[in-house]
């Protein structure tokens, strides 16, 4: 769905973050090279839908009557009041749940995440990992990155997404982990 003329769009450049509160009271931290679009009429009396391209951390204001939906090109995340991170830079999108509960819709599937669970898409399939260190996926909002046993090529891709830098990694080094 494309934005309507009255919709508000927040966009961040490489190397920058944006923190904002939506009209319904939800707090959002938008990562570098990301775009968030929402209706200025999203005031808790109707639908609470946003569109995300990139990455954002959400602290959703509780409202069981009006679910909060994050629509990305790869999945839809639905919450009624919770904290979670959505990474939707590319088709290897992911959701990390800090607290509360969210439903994630991927194609014809719907899955529920519980606190400290991480859902990632790989080759069009959803994989859920439980009891993860949520800080690894959310520390970017505090100006940090954590890598643990991560292939060098993945680290370089993450840095490229955030800082618009290019790396030329020799094939024999690509799978080294850090």
Walk through the language-model features, giving the residues of each.
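A residue-level detector for the "anchor" residue at the start of short, highly conserved motifs
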Residues: 1-178
